[in-house]
Structure formats: C-alpha cells, structure tokens
C-alpha cells in the first residue's frame, strides 16, 4: 500500500526479533517516485530515522534500518509494526478528544526546536517551507488541479473567488511561513498519520515532508485536514490557544512565543492548505 512509497508488512521468525516489521520502499508508480524524489521526500524520512528519532519528545515508531542513496533517492526504512494501534478515520473526522491529545503532542515537538529549526534545514535534515522547490512546483500543479476540479465539481462561492488567484499568491504564502521563530515541523500532521496506543496517546508516523518553518503550519494543516468543518469551526481557536499554552509549558522560550503573530501565521497557513485537496 502507499502513494509516495510502497509499504510492506514482513513476518519474521527467529530469536530476539519482532514478529513483524514494516518495510518502506519507493513507490511502484514512476510518477510518484519522480515527485517524491524532486521534493526530497525519501531523503527526509531516511534522515529522520538517522538523525532525529532519538531526540523526539513524542511517540514515533522504532526504527531498525534507514538508508538512502541521495543521488537516485532509492531508499529503505524498516520500522516497528504499529498495526495493533487504533486509527482515526480521516474521512469521518477526528474526535475533539483525540484532536486535543494530538495538539499537545505536536506542541512538545515544536517546543523542543522552537527558534532553532533553521539549523535542521541547513544540515539537510529537513526542507524549509520557504525552499525554492515549492514555489517552483506548486503553482503549476495547483493550476492543473484547479482546472480539473472546477470542470467536474460544484464549489462554494468563497472558494471560487479565491481559486483563480491562488497560484499567483502561493510564493508569498510560503515565504510568510518561515519568518520565524522557526521550528521542526512534521509537515504532514493529520489523522491518517496518527495512531493511538493503549493509553490513547498519539503516535506520529510518516516523516517524508519533515520541514522547518512556523509551527502554526502543522496546526493549520491538522485542523483543516483532520476535523469536520463543523468541529473545526467550533474548536479551532480553542485548539490554537491550547497549542500556544503548551509550547511554553513544554519549554519554548516565552519571549519567542507571540500569540497574535502566531494566529496570523495560523490563518495564513490555513489558507495555504487549500492547495492540498486541489492538488490531490
């Protein structure tokens, strides 16, 4: 299974080994491999398991092997099989209780690297949300998706007013998400990439879009991609405020946490997230 990657469950036998592991390899579809290679997705995930996994303050899978050829992007990750954990159905929408737990978890990660995220991008461990690859690629693919979407579906008037101008606005939206203070961003933090253990604690998976930028991006992405419109409208400000409070609780320097500026970043990122359903 998988879109940007092919995932396999491998059964193991023998002493001192788990009964199964998950093996992640490049996708079977050549177009998906091309896109994933261009966006350095395989390199990012391999680097996560090599450089960051032991520093993560949130639950993530155990990694057993991680290798990548940076010239060809051939890669392999062997990780813990979490198939026994509870999943949240993104099509149904995450419950508010699960959402609150997920917000607190990602706040712990953001707090650990708050104001220090740029170094990760400079070291090649992450890709900045302001990286030139995004404005080079996204306006074109958004334009293609928008043309197809508007020819086949009826859309709300508010979206129809924004869509024709969105590709032109994308570079500015992207640059606004790296004005700082920057931190480590999961990049794909949504219900499909969150499992819940026996204590109902979230376990984050899929680190192929690991990035550096404003942590508000992860929050906006999570809210817009994981909650129903009704739940999001009712709770988004509460979830945002919970995140800001949790940043300081988990160690982000209070002097670098500007609630008003972060709310603006959140709103900008939420607008940017229109790109995902259109491109998909």
Task: List where the protein language model places each region.
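Short, glycine/acidic-rich hinge or "gate" loops at secondary-structure transitions
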Residues: 66-68, 116-130, 254-262
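ATP-dependent phospho-/nucleotidyl transfer catalytic cores
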Residues: 85-186, 198
């Amino acid at each position: 299974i998988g879109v940007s990657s092919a995932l396999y469950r491998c059964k193991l036998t023998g002493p001192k080994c788990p009964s199964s592991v998950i093996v992640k390899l490049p996708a079977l579809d050549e177009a998906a491999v091309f896109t994933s290679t261009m966006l350095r997705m395989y390199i990012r995930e391999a680097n996560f398991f090599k450089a960051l996994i032991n520093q993560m303050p949130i639950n993530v899978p155990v990694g057993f092997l991680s290798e990548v050829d940076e010239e060809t992007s051939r890669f392999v990750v062997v990780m813990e099989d979490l198939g026994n954990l509870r999943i949240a159905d993104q099509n149904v929408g995450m419950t508010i209780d699960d959402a609150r737990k997920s917000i607190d978890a990602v706040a712990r990660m953001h707090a650990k690297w708050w104001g220090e995220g740029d170094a990760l991008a400079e070291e090649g461990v992450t890709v900045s949300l302001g990286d030139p690859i995004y404005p080079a690629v996204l306006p074109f693919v958004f334009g293609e998706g928008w043309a197809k979407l508007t020819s086949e579906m009826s859309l709300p008037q508010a979206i129809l007013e924004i869509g024709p101008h969105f590709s032109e606005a994308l570079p500015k939206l992207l640059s606004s998400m790296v004005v700082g203070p920057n931190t480590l961003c999961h990049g794909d933090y949504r219900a499909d990439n969150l499992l819940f253990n026996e204590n109902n604690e979230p376990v984050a998976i899929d680190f192929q879009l690991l990035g550096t930028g404003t942590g508000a991006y992860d929050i906006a992405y999570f809210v817009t991609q994981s909650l129903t419109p009704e739940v999001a409208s009712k709770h988004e400000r509460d979830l945002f405020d919970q995140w800001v409070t949790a940043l300081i609780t988990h160690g982000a320097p209070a002097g670098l946490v500007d609630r008003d500026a972060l709310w603006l970043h959140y709103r900008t990122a939420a607008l940017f997230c229109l790109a995902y359903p259109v491109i998909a």
